[in-house]
């Protein structure tokens, strides 16, 4: 009887289930979107019960599509939108509030208060993260302080916290297992990434009872088994990692200096730094890449707020293109950018600049500038931003980038990938299987149950669909990068500070 691995990929807008075979190929996919809740400006929530319902639904659907029985699943891997926070009553199993999503800014004011007390340095040293409303810690505190009776229940030991991975595992095991992995724990702003444990001092500062927190385990191990009510049989739950870390693993970035970029709405860059937690001097995050083989490995992470979203903007707001795919055709119809630069700082600019007062700009316009030049400049902006983050990573880690592995929607744009390679001066590799996030979770699950022997076997699965080699002269490259940095300087500090 042929065996498979099931991957549950719980994202920000949809719940998916992908089933993989031994070669790491996709056998079936099922997906359901769920509701985005916006109670106030800047607030974002999800319904945890809806997420669990949809996730269980797509798991059954993926089995049906693949025409395989639950007995053929050797293990289940979970990957999830990181930082999103669920608090529930362990006696009833019911959430006491909606899940507060990573994008939600409601606790920004409280983060400012902590910053005024000088706690940002403590938090960075212990967790590797910047003090920000993005991470789970202040979201948990908000629920405890604002939901009636929450604090009393927490003090009594009746409340549990989890990111989405923890919430799914708890439901899949009918409340038997309250667990997370090192990668997800490292995104809570409560986990000491050097000592590998929940940090007592941070829990005290934020007034969060330790009894709420899940046990932290490796990213690849058997956490427990699914309750039989779910599939009719018990299946080991054996892999767990946050989405970006899962993608790094799925791209087989197993050695220090290997990096991947996910070109989504935003771009997420992670570089493996091995067993060394590199402290960033350039505004990058230090995070746990994976917990496996009795140790943890670390990564540097840089986020680009506006990646593929700049193409959506060209399509929906400026109506320059009908589909994202058309951008490649327009970009190649002109020889160069004609001196035009587009800095997509619509919501400020992220790593390594970190200026929330920057705003979007189009610079270098002359009478000869056409729509094609603006479209080309928009695509190029993704490559320039990626270049800036990777240079910061090289500087912090002291490791020179050899090649960049890519995934996400915009990696299908051949013009962008070639330009990315030219600007970086290294090879850009697009894999055959671009479902790298789900694949990473599947690999972690499969390793724990012996479906794959080791990372060497997995590395052999990784196949290049297309490789892009740098073909631009150094002088031209330096001139373009200089122009980009000049454009970024003009975009910065634009919005008036209140």
Curated annotation (Swiss-Prot):
Chain sites annotated for binding ADP: 12, 16, 265, 308, 409, 413
Keywords: ATP-binding, Glycerol metabolism, Kinase, Nucleotide-binding, Transferase
Binding site for glycerol: 82-83, 134, 243-244
Activity regulation summary: Activated by phosphorylation and inhibited by fructose 1,6-bisphosphate (FBP).
SUPFAM superfamilies (alphabetical): Actin-like ATPase domain
The UniProt record lists the keyword Nucleotide-binding: yes
Reactions the enzyme catalyzes: glycerol + ATP = sn-glycerol 3-phosphate + ADP + H(+)
Biological pathway: Polyol metabolism; glycerol degradation via glycerol kinase pathway; sn-glycerol 3-phosphate from glycerol: step 1/1
Chain sites annotated for binding ATP: 12-14, 265, 308, 312, 409
Signal peptide: none
One CC-aspect GO term: cytosol
GO molecular function, one term: ATP binding
EC number: 2.7.1.30
GO BP term, example: glycerol-3-phosphate metabolic process
Subunit architecture: Homotetramer and homodimer (in equilibrium).
Family label: Belongs to the FGGY kinase family.
NCBIfam families reported in the protein's UniProt record: glycerol_kin (TIGR01311), PRK00047.1 (NF000756)
Function, as annotated: Key enzyme in the regulation of glycerol uptake and metabolism. Catalyzes the phosphorylation of glycerol to yield sn-glycerol 3-phosphate.
Name by which UniProt lists this protein: Glycerol kinase
Phylogenetic placement of the source organism: Bacteria, Bacillati, Bacillota, Clostridia, Eubacteriales
Gene giving rise to this polypeptide: glpK
């Amino acid at each position: 009887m042929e065996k498979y691995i099931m991957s549950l990929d719980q994202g920000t807008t949809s719940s998916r289930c992908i089933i993989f075979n031994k070669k790491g190929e996709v056998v079936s996919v099922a997906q359901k979107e769920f509701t985005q809740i916006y109670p106030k400006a800047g607030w974002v929530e999800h319904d945890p019960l809806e997420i669990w319902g949809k996730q269980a639904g797509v798991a059954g659907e993926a089995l049906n599509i693949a025409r395989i029985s639950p007995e053929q699943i050797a293990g289940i891997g979970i990957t999830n939108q990181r930082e999103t926070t669920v608090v529930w009553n362990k006696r009833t199993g019911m959430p006491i509030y909606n899940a507060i999503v990573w994008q939600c800014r409601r606790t920004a004011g409280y983060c400012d208060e902590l910053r005024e007390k000088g706690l940002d340095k403590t938090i960075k040293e212990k967790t590797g993260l910047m003090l920000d409303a993005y991470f789970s810690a202040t979201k948990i505190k908000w629920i405890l302080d604002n939901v009636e009776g929450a604090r009393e229940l927490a003090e009594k030991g009746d409340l549990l916290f989890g990111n989405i991975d923890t919430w799914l595992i708890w439901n899949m095991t009918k409340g038997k297992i309250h667990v997370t992995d090192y990668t997800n724990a490292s995104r809570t702003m409560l986990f000491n990434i050097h000592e590998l444990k929940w940090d007592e001092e941070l829990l005290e500062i934020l007034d969060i009872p330790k009894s709420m927190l899940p046990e932290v385990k490796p990213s690849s191990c058997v956490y427990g088994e699914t309750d039989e009510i779910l599939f009719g049989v018990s299946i080991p739950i054996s892999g767990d990692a946050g989405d970006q870390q899962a993608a790094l693993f799925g791209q087989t970035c197993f050695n220090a200096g290997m990096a991947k970029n996910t070109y989504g709405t935003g771009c997420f860059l992670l570089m493996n730094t091995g067993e060394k937690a590199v402290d960033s001097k350039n505004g990058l995050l230090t995070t746990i890449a994976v917990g496996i083989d009795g140790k943890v490995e670390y990564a540097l992470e840089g986020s680009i707020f506006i990646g593929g979203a700049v193409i959506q903007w060209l399509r929906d707001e400026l109506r320059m293109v009908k589909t994202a795919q058309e951008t490649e055709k327009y970009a190649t119809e002109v020889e160069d950018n004609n001196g035009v630069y587009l800095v997509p700082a619509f919501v400020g600019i992220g790593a390594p600049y970190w200026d929330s007062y920057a705003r979007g700009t189009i610079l270098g316009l002359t009478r000869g500038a056409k729509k094609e030049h603006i479209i080309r400049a928009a695509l190029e902006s993704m490559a320039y931003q990626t270049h800036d983050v990777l240079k910061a990573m090289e500087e912090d880690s002291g490791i020179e980038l050899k090649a960049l592995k890519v995934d996400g929607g915009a990696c299908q744009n051949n013009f962008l990938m070639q330009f990315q390679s030219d600007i970086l001066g290294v090879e850009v590799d697009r894999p055959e299987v671009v479902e790298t996030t789900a694949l990473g979770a599947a690999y972690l699950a499969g390793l724990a149950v012996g479906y794959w022997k080791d990372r060497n076997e997995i590395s052999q699965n990784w196949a290049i669909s297309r490789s892009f080699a740098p073909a631009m002269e150094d002088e031209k490259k330096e001139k373009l990068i200089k122009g980009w940095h000049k454009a970024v300087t003009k975009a910065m500090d634009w919005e008036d500070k209140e």
